[in-house]
Amino acid sequence: MSISLLLEMASSTDPDRTAIVAGDLRLTTGELSELADGGAGLVAASGAAHVAYVGAGGAMLPLLLFASARAGVPVTPLNYRLSADGLRALIARLPDPIVVVDDEYREAVGDGFRVIGSAEFLAQARNAEPAAEFPDPDSVGVVLFTSGTTSAPKAVELTHNNLTSYITGTVEFASAEPGDAALICVPPYHIAGVSAALSNLYAGRKMVYLTQFDAREWVRLVETENVTSATVVPTMLDRIVTVLDEQGATLPTLRTLAYGGSKVALPLVRKALELLPGVGFVNAYGLTETSSTIAVLTPDDHRVALGSDDASVAKRLGSVGQPVPSIEVQIRAEDGTVLGAGETGELFVRGEQVSGRYTGIGSVLDDEGWFPTKDVATLDEHGYLYIGGRSDDTIIRGGENIAPAEIEDVLVEHPHVRDCAVVGPEDPEWGQIIVAVVVPAAGTDPQPEDLRDFVRAQLRGSRTPDRVVFRDELPTNATGKVLRRDLVSELSSAAKEPA
């Protein structure tokens, strides 16, 4: 099944339903379908083998997803926040592309590629000779570059079948109520942005786009557009909670708030649940290579865990929930042995929505179709999945493997800690040492030794940070993932400076 069919189903069922609200632009499903046909005609006439998009999103993302599909070529939304050199390097890795670019990023793209402005593409699509085909479901529909927080960005190839398997396996067609609206503020170059466009269109929800995130504007849009569902990343949730606390807003129309993209501190989750008791919170865990979500902590899971006196149940608030029905999971030891409940190892996943294929590398699935996520994980006896961070982040201190997440989960519970990251810069004596980078809570002045004592009291002595340093903010990417390499580089450089 191709993603073209998702739009065909939506537009033929209710062509007059509002599909997109992006600033002053409003499009019905019928209008989106017509523009996609015209956009496909533009792409086909250009002779391009690939469509690249450099921009903040809004209506352009769903339009280019479907226009590219109907032209029979893949599309790649790119990170518009990259440097000009970084952006051009990624475009150069795409085969014979046409680059659709928002005006403010035109200079960054440069003159070395075939380029058309987003506004011009939209205008020409209204009158272009249409083209519409349903591509081979096994052909590549979307290529996304990984964030590159631990290595150089890889180009993940997602087929139409990968994407539609995720949508049809997790969303019921036309299941939304007539007044339902989804607020989308995740970046277009992230898998969450792609899946939000496809899943909300398929469900029948109006999509309200906020292309430049601002917490006050987010709250305003929820209230004025009667938003019923939204998806945010941890840094966004933190800012939204701050605004809600200041304003006392209750957001009565909001029924579901999904969060994901990176680990969320439990005190923040508890605060959000306290401020919005009528909202169903969803923790969604997935990867680019899995076409989005593969495990979900449901609203009921949140409520039960928050209100439970049973430590084993309350602990679930820190999990990513249970795998979705279409996904199989295994936890494996380093030697490939499949581990049992409660044992920690690398997470492997399998399912129709799982790609595991990279441009220039090929498939990394094993002979039985399992994908190595590189995430350290544990599956408990009730099927709840706990993610302990990336295997690449593991600190090896004096020959002992230490998961940063274990220490971070303790530190963030200290009342004087708003956020933290634990990293392992190299050390001539220990191989690596444990350094906790802490963002203090507002109005507090935490002392390094107090925080070290706090960790030591709850974990083994070998888990106690060797050093504690303070920062106003942690460096993160657009989805809230901490840029650990930047922290390690900064700490290593500081260690080399003369006293």
What is each residue range found by the language model?
Residues 28-31, 141-168:
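Conserved AMP-binding A3 loop
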Residues 319-326, 334-368, 402:
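Conserved ATP/PPi-binding loop(s) of AMP-dependent carboxylate-activating enzymes
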Residues 164-181, 189-229, 243:
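Conserved AMP-binding/adenylation subdomain of ANL enzymes
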Residues 202, 227-231, 243-314, 328:
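Gly/Ser/Thr-rich phosphate-binding loop
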Residues 25, 40-82, 401:
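Conserved AMP-binding/adenylate-forming
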Residues 3-4, 128-145, 152, 175-181, ...:
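Conserved pre-ATP/AMP-binding loop-to-beta segment of ANL
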Residues 103-138, 310-311:
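ANL superfamily adenylate-forming
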Residues 82, 230, 351, 356-357, ...:
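AMP-binding/adenylate-forming catalytic core of the ANL superfamily
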